[in-house]
Amino acid sequence: MNYQKYHKLYFDVPPFARTWPGKQITSAPRWCSVDLRDGNQALFSPMTLEEKVAFFKLLVKIGFKEIEVGFPAASETEYQFTRYLIENDLIPEDVTIQVLTQSRDHIIKKTVEALEGAHHAIIHLYNSTSALQREVVFHKSREEIIQLAVDGVRMIQKYADDRFSYEYSPESFSCTEMDFAVEICNAVIREFAPTPEKKLIINLPTSVEVSTPNIYADQVEYMSQHLDRRDSVIVSVHTHNDRGTGVASSELALLAGAQRVEGTLFGNGERTGNADIAVIALNMFSVGIDPQLNLDNLEEIIDAYKKFNKLPIHPRHPYAGAMAYTAFSGSHQDAIKKAMDYCETHKQPYWQNPYLTIDPTDLNRVYEPILINSQSGKGGLSYVLETKFGLTVPKALLQEFSATIKIVSDGKHTVLEPEEIYDIFEKYYVNLKDKAELVDYHFKLAGEEAHLDANVKLCGKTRMLSAQGNGPLDALSNALRAETGKAFEIVFYNEHALEGSSSSKAATYIAINDTQGNMYWGVGIHPNINTSSVLALLSAFGKLL
């Protein structure tokens, strides 16, 4: 690869007293969704009017107070959508729509016409400022680019009134020399003459992401320190994801003085997309900061996104991906399971889980499935068997069972569904009949001693067994030893109800050792606890034959 073909497209930030590296995010910014413009223009099939209206209502429900609805002068569809929202009174009083415009008289005039009847709105003026675009696209000098922006401000002031707020973006800011970015933004600030009561938004986009997020943070803080009338300006950011760090760039920009973030749900947008506002907001949520957005029904938002944008969400997408709350690794599964068990028995003021930074139920999502493959361990198996089927399987049995699961999963080269896992568990351990099958039994207690009579098929032949012991299991063990000559000892016994009612089934786990120390496990499941114990012992003993 010829790396010498390339060079950095950003300009070094002049030396200044940066402060952002020592800061942390402590509160949510102003959010502005650009799904209906930046997002929509990047779709294979842009949304219809009806879909846009439904998406707008979704954004309002989520809690966005600023929503970019389009570029009314760019197409009749976007103009009509803006009019539809206004004429049908679909914009809540506390929500401000935002519209884009270029610095041309007829475009600005139509933009303002589109806003007729709106209680308030943001008119967003932009023009490109990067050295590359000035040279190869517009063939204009710095002075001409500044004049273009100033002329745009004057045309807006000619047509608009005091109902509106204003935003200016030096498009391709991330590829613009810092001294020129400061110069053009301050020229716009002087022309708009904002006040602390009526602030101007200066939006600093990475129209194309060309640097690491720390460079962008330096650019933002440098601008924040050098803008005129800083108390009358809202510094906004609009990051793209060309290098895969759109979210990080927005987050570091907040440390660097940004007060507002533009982005889209799940990062839709041109090329590799915009910053994902849902991820930024949930990152804040995960450290105890109120994001000021309602993402507690994430599944509904995901479904709407897929429906309106006709785009999938990557299964590994943070928070929203189908596999965001799954674990294949055995050690991860074990840690998740232990943490959830600990939280059940030790009430904590905060969510604590080694691999789940947010409780999925807070997003109307679920822990399942913990997915089982050849890399999974006993923690994942324990979770699936307990949560899906009510089986609290002993650790030693899980260890043995996990080896079986690895063999099966390796052979299938795929993930095992919970029902498949249970079927395998049942096949190898539960109520086995291959070599030791219960036909019927009867026992009675006489003082501390139990007498047992049982019909049992041993290797296909029915045997009538009778013996005494200090309980049904001890009596059956004595009978099996006497009948077969096989010596063994019960080394583990545990039982529990599968459900909480008196009519529920019982599960019994038994392990036996032969004279060589080999261990054999059996599980019995039956409505009667004594019968489940007998079945468990016979399941284990059959493996000894």
Segment roles from a protein language model:
Residues 204-206, 262-270, 282-294, 363-370, ...:
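Short beta-alpha connecting loops at secondary-structure transitions
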